[in-house]
Amino acid sequence: MATIVVAMSGGVDSSAVAAMLHEQGHHVIGITLQLYDYGIAVGKKNACCAGKDIYDAKMVANKLGIPHYVLDYENKFKESVIDNFVNSYLHGETPLPCVQCNKLVKFRDLINTAKELGADKLATGHYVRKINGYNGAELHTGLDAAKDQSYFLFTITREQLEYLIFPLGGFTKYETRKLASKFGLDVADKPDSQDICFVPDGNYKTVINKIRPEASTSGKIVHINGFELGEHSGIINYTIGQRRGLGIAYNEPLYVVKIDPSNNIVYVGQESALHVHEFIIKDVNWLADEIKDNEKLAVDVKIRSTRPPCHAEISKLCNDKIKVQFLSAEKAVAPGQACVIYAGERVLGGGWITRNIR
């Protein structure tokens, strides 16, 4: 049997993984990362990093009789994730902090810690599958499409993927809860996390204004045809595709279509102005063979975790960025979000949306 470290968040998924591996006879070690000021977050029920989650993880470990460690990563989390989140909004982007956390904190440091403990593998409760392919490990979507989390894991490296295991990849959420109940875990009916862990009340603007008070500097709201319509209360209050809360009167519905942080301008226009045919992604991470120069590849892409994949064609640009061309125009492609590239159920890679070419 193997020594396996389980990343325990205190939720039902990772708790079920720890119990399952323990029952199989593996030597299981639980690790929970303290990422935020839990004194503030205590009592928050819908975020993955609330203080009670550490307690829940510890209680599960005690019930199973496995060692459990809590690692304090608050400073690194602030520098790598929270500051990035704030800066992204100030640059007119719509950030995705959970992916940055996976890349810069969770997987990198958990894998290093697991290896220091002599573990053979690191297990998580993500709903994705690792499949041994001809050229090594491949990342595939979870069998439960409603819970698939592959979109959030595109930044892991091939080397990291070889070391990781995802025992819930073939499970549905119902089956996971049933398994946790079978093991008598108190977290079996615990609600799923919803909020960003460092946004206690779901209002990210409060967090940004606390760190960067200048974020609420007012500016102009301008129609894409060039005329001024009103004043905004800070670009952090707006995201691409937004319709509600613009505070301007017009004879037809208007949407945020562009944010210009350099000039502190929010541009609005009709819904048709949101349609995008192609865009550029940067900082691409490949979990399959990288696309070649002058090659065009037909793929599926996801531009939001909640959206279904859509058909596209990708090609490599001279600066190692990737151009993504939709077969049919898509709405509200937001810079700062991730674009994950698929071939069927396999994750080929992904990158960060940097700009749109309408």
UniProtKB/Swiss-Prot annotation:
It is found in: Cytoplasm. HAMAP family: tRNA_thiouridyl_MnmA. It comes from the Bacteria. ATP binds at A7, M8, S9, G10, G11, V12, D13, S14, L33, G125. This is tRNA-specific 2-thiouridylase MnmA. GO terms for biological process: tRNA wobble position uridine thiolation. GO terms for cellular component: cytoplasm. Disulfide bonds join C101-C197. The record marks H126, Q337 as: Interaction with tRNA. Belongs to the MnmA/TRMU family. Gene3D superfamilies: Adenine nucleotide alpha hydrolases-like domains (2.30.30.280), HUPs (3.40.50.620), Translation factors (2.40.30.10). Its EC number is 2.8.1.13. Residues 147-149 are annotated as: Interaction with tRNA. The active site is at C101 (nucleophile), C197 (cysteine persulfide intermediate). Catalyzes the 2-thiolation of uridine at the wobble position (U34) of tRNA, leading to the formation of s(2)U34. One of its GO terms (molecular function) is ATP binding. It catalyses: S-sulfanyl-L-cysteinyl-[protein] + uridine(34) in tRNA + AH2 + ATP = 2-thiouridine(34) in tRNA + L-cysteinyl-[protein] + A + AMP + diphosphate + H(+).
